[in-house]
Amino acid sequence: MVNYPHNPIRQKVTPLQKQQKHRQVDFANRGMSFEAAINATNAYYLAKGIAVIHKKPTPIQIVKVDYPRRSRAKIVEAYFKQASTTDYSGIYKGHYIDFEAKETRQKTAMPMKNFHAHQIEHMAAVLKQKGICFVLLHFATLKETYYLPAKALIDFYQIDRGNKSMPLDYIRKNGFEVKLGAFPQVPYLDIIEQKFLGGDYN
């Protein structure tokens, strides 16, 4: 069969292909939480030899332990303790990285009740030692994620000791939007390179 220029064969596009073409890349579309997406991002950085950043284990308080056997101990009652520092830490190009991650379904502000005084103190201590410290803030309803330097968070917290929510306008003015992707899903190192180190990790 000869296909003349005035009558080209049109390739059929299935509804699924149309959906995949126009759908925004978002970890939520894969049924992932914000935390899981960050963990996957860190695993990507580690596998590629880019950075070594891990989630800190949540501390627990053991209340009751049973000993069914002399050589075995079984925890039967425990509860999570309030974290004294931040969620993640590690190293990238010789720089100490330390950050917290928060998510909200609100559209106009990030609740400051999500941050505790000892976490703010920890971030200030990291900055004093010249570490790179920040928070990743995800607005689930808006599908927007921001990198906010720790100094901007600390400055806002000190206004009224964290009793009011942080407006999205403040975050946009003092932070940087993280464009979500596939590999990695939450490419926050892009912000560190572009805004603070002036290079490119690729």
Curated annotation (Swiss-Prot):
GO molecular function: endonuclease activity; magnesium ion binding; nucleic acid binding
Superkingdom of origin organism: Bacteria
Gene3D superfamilies found in the cross-reference section: 3.40.1350.10
UniProt-listed CDD domains: RecU-like
EC number per UniProt: 3.1.21.10
Cofactor comment: Binds 1 Mg(2+) ion per subunit.
Lineage: Bacteria, Bacillati, Bacillota, Bacilli, Lactobacillales
Catalytic activity: Endonucleolytic cleavage at a junction such as a reciprocal single-stranded crossover between two homologous DNA duplexes (Holliday junction)
Essential cofactor(s): Mg(2+)
Binding-site residues, Mg(2+): T85, D87, E100, Q119
UniProt GO cellular component terms: cytoplasm
SUPFAM superfamilies found in the cross-reference section: Restriction endonuclease-like
Source species of the chain: Streptococcus equi subsp. zooepidemicus (strain MGCS10565)
Coarse class of the protein's main subcellular location: cytoplasm
Name listed for the protein in its UniProt record: Holliday junction resolvase RecU
